[in-house]
């Protein structure tokens, strides 16, 4: 039977930096969750947290591998939690939980996917944590899913991105949910095709105008070191037609031959897959990732962007420690993949990047570029504790609507190559602050 309980806990952390101020950082505890690998704290959870009309929702795996759903009034210290009967193979860190709330207030849930059949449900009514029995979306291409991601459009309808097929041979598929009919339909059978030779690892973003931006690296095999290049596309009509940054229309599916290259990055550059992107107020695309430049030994974070006159990039030379991404499975990596948020526009845009680095004690950290054109930055730590293998995920809708940043926080420990570690369940928290920059 489902378990429902109320939890209240809040910690106040003062945090002050020279250029940007987080006057009060609050950390609210939801409960304890599975921590034996990074499945609860992988960056490609879209979403781990989501807000809608004054309420916030969260999801994570319990120690018993069950999906736990949580809800609170925005800013409240009290969480209502519900342990569902849905279980996941938590030993595989790919099998993340993703949630989103549609424009009618229904909660949508996808969980436990790594080259296996669709696991999807939605709430029985708006605002509820009680879910219907698992169901299909459209009944096609639902047997070998990975990387489920929800995105809410300005009209309240949803998009559902996923990979159909295994690593090195998968295609990107998009479904669309209509809130009026409460049904899913296929939007793109193969937006990006690896032609059974490779696959795209993407990150996507829906801007304030509803334009869908997507960027991706190609991978030639299950070996992470075969990642290469950074490509880009966008849709101005809800995902039906796609264009390059110069407005040139794509013939679909997009392939390695036809894709626009934002940046050429060779294989064996320690280029990571599945990071994040965003846009400035004018809809200009920004992408963050990390890789090792040629003739360098240390992978560094990089910012890639296009202000309307072509692609540009620069390295954030923060790091001193080399590492390698060679091999398959989920790696134990000394840094997290980064999340990015942008304020302002053009060369005056401010860029905020959230990340974790063992060189900084494994804390959640924030890097601010106050003015893009100056290419200078500063870093502030957001937590005091070492978060192990944590990667940042956040409430995209709360940030979009109110510029309040809520991060999903949990200490997790990932073994290299898809193993699990010996660690007790760890607290699942939401760290909330409003960056002033």
Map each language-model feature to its residues:
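Bacterial N-terminal signal peptides
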Residues: 8-19
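Positively charged n-region of N-terminal signal peptides that target proteins for export
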Residues: 1-7
């Amino acid at each position: 039977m489902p378990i429902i309980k109320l939890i209240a806990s809040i910690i106040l952390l003062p945090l002050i930096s020279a250029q940007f101020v987080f006057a009060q950082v609050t950390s609210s505890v939801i409960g304890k969750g599975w921590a034996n690998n990074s499945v609860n704290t992988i960056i490609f959870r879209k979403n781990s947290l989501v807000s809608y009309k004054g309420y916030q929702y969260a999801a994570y795996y319990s120690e018993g591998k069950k999906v736990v759903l949580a809800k609170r009034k925005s800013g409240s210290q009290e969480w209502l939690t519900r342990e569902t009967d849905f279980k996941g193979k938590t030993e595989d860190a790919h099998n993340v939980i993703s949630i989103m709330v549609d424009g009618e207030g229904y909660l949508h849930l996808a969980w436990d996917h790594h080259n296996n059949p669709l696991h999807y449900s939605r709430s029985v009514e708006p605002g509820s944590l009680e879910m219907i029995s698992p169901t299909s979306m459209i009944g096609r291409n639902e047997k070998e899913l990975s990387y489920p991601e929800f995105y809410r459009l300005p009209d309240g309808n949803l998009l559902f991105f996923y990979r159909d097929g295994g690593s090195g041979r998968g295609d990107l598929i998009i479904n669309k949910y209509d809130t009026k009919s409460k049904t899913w339909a296929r939007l793109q059978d193969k937006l990006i095709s690896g032609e059974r030779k490779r696959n795209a690892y993407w990150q996507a973003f829906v801007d304030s105008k509803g334009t869908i931006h997507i960027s991706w690296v190609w991978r030639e095999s299950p070996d992470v070191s075969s990642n290469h290049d950074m490509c880009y596309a966008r849709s101005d009509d809800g995902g039906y037609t796609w264009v390059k940054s110069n407005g040139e229309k794509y013939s679909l599916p997009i392939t390695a031959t036809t894709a626009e290259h934002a940046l050429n990055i060779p294989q064996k550059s320690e280029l990571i897959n599945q990071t994040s992107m965003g846009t400035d107020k004018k809809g200009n695309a920004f992408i963050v990732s990390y890789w090792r430049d040629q003739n360098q030994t240390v992978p560094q974070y990089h910012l890639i962007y296009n202000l309307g006159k072509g692609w540009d990039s620069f390295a954030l030379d923060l790091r001193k420690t080399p590492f390698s991404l060679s091999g398959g499975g989920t790696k134990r990596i000394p840094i997290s993949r980064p999340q990015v948020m942008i304020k302002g526009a053009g060369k005056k845009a401010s860029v905020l990047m959230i990340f974790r680095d063992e060189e900084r004690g494994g804390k959640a950290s924030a890097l601010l570029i106050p003015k893009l054109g100056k290419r200078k930055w500063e870093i502030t730590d957001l937590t005091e504790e070492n978060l192990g293998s944590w990667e940042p995920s956040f409430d995209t809708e709360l940030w979009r609507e109110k510029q309040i940043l809520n991060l999903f926080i949990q200490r997790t420990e990932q073994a290299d190559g898809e193993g699990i570690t010996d660690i007790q369940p760890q607290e699942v928290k939401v760290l909330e602050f409003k960056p002033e920059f």
